[in-house]
């Protein structure tokens, strides 16, 4: 039996020692060159020939996509930067305030599969242009809502989800079709730097524009103008690359889209995709909760410590904590994303499971520091900021790595759909409900104590401690991902190269390339 496991498999030539056929560089992992577990990476000329774009143009496209990603997150967290003012203006409690983020995320979550389906089949550039133009108009409209119509603010924040859904499900797949291997990882890290930087700029812009204008409504009027510029850049700079071409062998036929139902079944049978999405869900839960509630929590901490006056109806609330938290978010995001990508890149040389293991380490490491940040807030605001800095840095290590995992375990014609359903899962169980849940728990706890500024602080403090527990669960999901990552990556590479085709609802069949040569294949590496 041991001999049969390494016998020539699917041979079309008499010479068992022949290498791969011309135009078919070594197969991935054990099916090709045993010295390399990666696809052969095209050089600059090869990428230019395949994509029809120069390296400079491809890099410029990534810069434009990064700018729009930054803008999306800047808009999302501008609201958090003026959250206390919104509470006072509309005279609402913590539960209703949490609904602002929940409604937006719910809309985003519902629309993501729609744009995922369209993004795998139609021109991605025009889909993004339309979505971002609509988002800019709705965001501008939300800044003119009178105080008696809070429901209208919720409606407009929900419609903002159209723009984010049209962009977030599609943009990473464009990067995947422009670059491969380490080049792709580097470009994804640049793209995902925009998330923490944009989030931090949202806090800063929201608080500072409010201070300068004397009215929080003006904070919501900054990003729509920048959105118009984003649409122009998309239209003039971005070009649609062929899907999956940079990963195919020169002799392999292009992949054709399958039905939406077939895509869903294939993704559900991909344990690396499912488990990494669950791990990312915990990241979304924690970041969504902190994004909305951390500035308010820090303000309440300062009030309890006697460092700032309380925010009373009719008064302008202190914006210093929004500014500081925004700066921390920017710095920790850049540091965390960069550290995560670099550590993972170095560890991959020795361990092919490095990506999920780094993600697990980041989440498991962040949990105790977030707990300490909350526990110390009653005694020292400086210690709280230090622990938040460390916790958010570890948490940010996941962003680019999770995106890279999805792109190499899912075939190109399913990537937008996979992005969409990762968004649905991470928001459905993550930040769609976490801000509202934290606010609801805070309200319930506060009602059980005598009214005071201390009870407001303690209620939010105890409710936010849920984040540390959820972060630990996410770390466990990434440890599970590490068990399957090698096999799922190899399967996706075989599909792209035309060596593994689906023939039924649950079976895969190996097909011989048209110019097939004798190849020694461990059967155990194929029948997975």
Curated annotation (Swiss-Prot):
Transmembrane portions of the chain: 60-80, 98-118, 126-146, 160-180, 187-207, 218-238, 278-298, 323-343, 357-377, 381-401, 421-441, 465-485
Compartments, as annotated in UniProt: Lysosome membrane
Chain positions with N-acetylalanine modification: 2
Membrane topology: Multi-pass membrane protein
Major localization listed first in the record, in broad terms: membrane
Classification via SUPFAM superfamilies: MFS general substrate transporter
Domain of life: Eukaryota
GO cellular component: lysosomal membrane; lysosome
Region (Disordered): 1-38
A GO MF term: transmembrane transporter activity
Catalytic reactions of this protein: a 1-acyl-sn-glycero-3-phosphocholine(out) + H(+)(out) = a 1-acyl-sn-glycero-3-phosphocholine(in) + H(+)(in); 1-hexadecanoyl-sn-glycero-3-phosphocholine(out) + H(+)(out) = 1-hexadecanoyl-sn-glycero-3-phosphocholine(in) + H(+)(in); 1-(9Z-octadecenoyl)-sn-glycero-3-phosphocholine(out) + H(+)(out) = 1-(9Z-octadecenoyl)-sn-glycero-3-phosphocholine(in) + H(+)(in); 1-(5Z,8Z,11Z,14Z-eicosatetraenoyl)-sn-glycero-3-phosphocholine(out) + H(+)(out) = 1-(5Z,8Z,11Z,14Z-eicosatetraenoyl)-sn-glycero-3-phosphocholine(in) + H(+)(in)
Keywords: Acetylation, Lipid transport, Lysosome, Membrane, Phosphoprotein, Transmembrane, Transmembrane helix, Transport
Keyword Magnesium: no
Single biological process term from Gene Ontology: regulation of lysosomal lumen pH
Family: Belongs to the major facilitator superfamily. Spinster (TC 2.A.1.49) family.
PANTHER family linked: PROTEIN SPINSTER HOMOLOG 1 (PTHR23505:SF13), SPINSTER (PTHR23505)
Complex and partners: Interacts with BCL2 and BCL2L1.
Function: Plays a critical role in the phospholipid salvage pathway from lysosomes to the cytosol. Mediates the rate-limiting, proton-dependent, lysosomal efflux of lysophospholipids, which can then be reacylated by acyltransferases in the endoplasmic reticulum to form phospholipids. Selective for zwitterionic headgroups such as lysophosphatidylcholine (LPC) and lysophosphatidylethanolamine (LPE), can also transport lysophosphatidylglycerol (LPG), but not other anionic lysophospholipids, sphingosine, nor sphingomyelin.
Designated name of the protein: Protein spinster homolog 1
Organism annotation: Mus musculus
């Amino acid at each position: 039996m041991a001999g049969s496991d390494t016998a020539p498999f699917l041979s079309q030539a008499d010479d068992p020692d022949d290498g791969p056929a011309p135009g078919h560089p070594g197969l991935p992992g054990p099916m090709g060159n045993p010295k390399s577990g990666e696809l052969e990476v095209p050089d600059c000329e090869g990428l230019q020939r395949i994509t029809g774009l120069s390296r400079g143009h491809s890099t410029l496209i990534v810069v434009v996509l990064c700018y729009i990603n930054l803008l999306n997150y800047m808009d999302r967290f501008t609201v958090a930067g003026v959250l206390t003012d919104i509470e006072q203006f509309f005279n609402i409690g913590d539960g209703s305030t949490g609904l602002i983020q929940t409604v937006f995320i719910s809309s985003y979550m519902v629309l993501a599969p729609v744009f995922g389906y369209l993004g795998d089949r139609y021109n991605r550039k025009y889909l993004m242009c339309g979505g971002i133009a609509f988002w800019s108009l709705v965001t501008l409209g939300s800044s003119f809502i009178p105080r008696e119509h809070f429901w209208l603010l919720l409606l407009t924040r929900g419609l903002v989800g159209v723009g984010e859904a049209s962009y977030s499900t599609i943009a990473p797949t464009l990067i995947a079709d422009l670059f491969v291997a380490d080049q792709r990882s580097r470009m994804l890290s640049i793209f995902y730097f925009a998330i923490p930087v944009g989030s931090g700029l949202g806090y800063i812009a929201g608080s500072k524009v409010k201070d300068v204008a004397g009215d929080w409504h003006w904070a919501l009027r900054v990003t729509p103008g920048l959105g118009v510029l984003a649409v122009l850049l998309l239209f003039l700079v971005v070009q649609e690359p062929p899907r999956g071409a940079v990963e195919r062998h020169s002799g392999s036929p292009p992949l054709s889209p399958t039905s939406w139902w077939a895509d869903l079944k294939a993704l559900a049978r991909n344990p690396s995709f499912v488990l990494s999405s669950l791990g990312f869900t915990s990241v979304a839960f924690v970041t969504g909760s902190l994004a909305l509630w951390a500035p308010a929590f820090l303000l309440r901490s300062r009030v309890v410590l006697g460092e700032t006056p309380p925010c009373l109806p009719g008064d302008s609330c202190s914006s210093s904590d929004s500014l500081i938290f925004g700066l921390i978010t920017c710095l920790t995001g850049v540091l965390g994303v960069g550290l995560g990508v670099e550590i993972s890149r170095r560890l991959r040389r020795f361990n092919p499971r490095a990506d999920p293991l780094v993600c697990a380490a980041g989440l498991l490491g962040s949990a105790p520091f977030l707990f300490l940040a909350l526990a110390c807030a009653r005694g020292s605001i400086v210690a709280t900021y230090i622990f938040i800095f460390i916790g958010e840095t570890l948490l940010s290590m996941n962003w680019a790595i999770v995106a890279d995992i999805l792109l190499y375990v899912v075939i190109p014609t399913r990537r937008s759909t996979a992005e969409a359903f990762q968004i649905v899962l991470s928001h459905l169980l993550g930040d769609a409900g976490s801000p509202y849940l934290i606010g609801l728990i805070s309200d319930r706890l506060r009602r059980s104590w005598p009214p005071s500024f201390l009870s407001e602080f303690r209620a939010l403090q105890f409710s936010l401690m849920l984040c540390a527990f959820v972060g630990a669960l996410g770390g466990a999901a990434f440890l599970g991902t590490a068990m399957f990552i090698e096999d799922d990556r190899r399967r996706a590479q075989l599909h792209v190269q035309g060596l593994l085709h689906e023939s039924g609802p649950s079976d895969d069949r190996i097909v011989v390339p048209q110019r097939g040569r004798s190849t020694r294949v461990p059967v155990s590496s194929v029948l997975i």
